[in-house]
Structures are given as C-alpha cells and as structure tokens.
C-alpha cells in the first residue's frame, strides 16, 4: 500500500478551564487515574500515618482520544477505571506482585466468571508499558469476549511499576524527599515500588 506522510496524533483530550479559550487556561482530560494517587502520595502518608506496605484505591473516569474506538464498551473514548496503587519495599515487590496477581484473578472468578472464559497471560517484552521493567512482572487478566480477536481481551492488568512514577514526580517537581518513604525503624528514606492492579469497570460489566 501507499504510505502517507507522518502525522502527529493527539491521544489526550484538550480543553480550557473557564469560559474563554485562553491558551494560559489549557487543560487536558486525564488519560489514566493513577497519577493523582502518586501526586498525593505524601499527603496520604502525612494524614493517615500509614506504614509500608499499604495501598491507595480509587475508581473514576479516564479519557483517551482513541483513533479507532470499537467493540461496544471494550474500546471507547470515555471509560471507568478501578485501580489500586500498592506501595511496597523494593525487596518485597516480587512477592507482592505474585500475591496481587493471584488475588485479582480469583476476584473475577468470585463474581461468577467461568475459568473457561478467563485466562492470565504474562505480557511479552514488546507489550511492556514505559513504566514496566523487563522481568519485574506485568500480566493481563483476559476474558473471552465475542468480539475480540483471537478471542480474549484484557479485563485487568497487574503491573510492577517499580519506582518509576514516584521518581518522575520527584525529579520534575524538585521535591525529591517528598516522594520518598521514611522508614523509622531503619532510619532511611527510599522510593517505594508499586504494584498496580488496574481494571476496566465498563469491560467487567
């Protein structure tokens, strides 16, 4: 076939805060719900006095300017996500990844989904997200939808996000220690690793 010239695709919805289209009021609808949790990591620690390991869960809307929305509620531009960001010590990340992968698979079974229509599939190297580290752990819980090829489509992903997000917020905010956890018993600070189960509530319907 004939190739066109490269074009830039915007996968985020752009809007303006307020009634006027003022460039200084440009805003974007969030493409995922997770970053609000990472941005408020320190606030949760200071107000709740939680100790690692602990998790922050939420459910909310996300928006993606999908190039080809299709398959009913499977791929849409507005969707509901339910996520857990579970903060752990780096040395315990593998054990917690295994724990949450098993827990989440069993949860889908517990609400009545037959094992015949459900599978757990580790992601390949080419599928890993930018925050995932090869070998750290990233799997999809998939359902046999009638409209997905080759028969299974993602219901939920369980990912070991390492300390990628907290380090990014620390670097770009200039407040490094704010995104570290202070271990009082060992008297040291470190960036926790994150295990993230992230499910599509619409797809689960």
Locate predicted features.
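TRNA-recognition modules of translation machinery and tRNA-sensing kinases, especially anticodon-binding
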Residues: 1-205
């Amino acid at each position: 076939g004939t190739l066109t010239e490269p074009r830039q695709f915007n996968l985020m919805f752009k809007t303006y805060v307020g009634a006027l289209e003022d460039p200084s009021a440009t805003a974007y609808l969030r493409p995922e719900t997770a970053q609000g949790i990472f941005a408020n990591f320190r606030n949760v620690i200071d107000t709740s006095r939680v100790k690692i390991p602990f998790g922050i869960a939420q459910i909310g809307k996300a928006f993606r300017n999908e190039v080809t929305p299709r398959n009913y509620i499977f791929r849409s531009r507005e969707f509901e996500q339910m996520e857990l960001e579970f903060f752990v010590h780096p040395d315990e990340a593998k054990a917690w990844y295994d724990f949450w992968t098993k827990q989440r698979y069993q949860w889908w079974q517990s609400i009545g989904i037959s094992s015949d229509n459900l599978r757990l599939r580790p992601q390949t190297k080419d599928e890993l997200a930018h925050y995932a580290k090869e070998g750290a752990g990233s799997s999809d819980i998939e359902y046999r939808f009638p409209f997905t090829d080759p028969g299974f489509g993602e219901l939920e992903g369980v990912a070991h996000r390492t300390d990628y997000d907290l380090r990014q917020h620390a670097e770009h905010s200039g407040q490094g220690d704010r995104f570290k956890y202070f271990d009082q018993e060992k008297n040291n600070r470190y960036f926790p690793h994150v295990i993230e189960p992230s499910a599509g509530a619409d797809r689960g319907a």
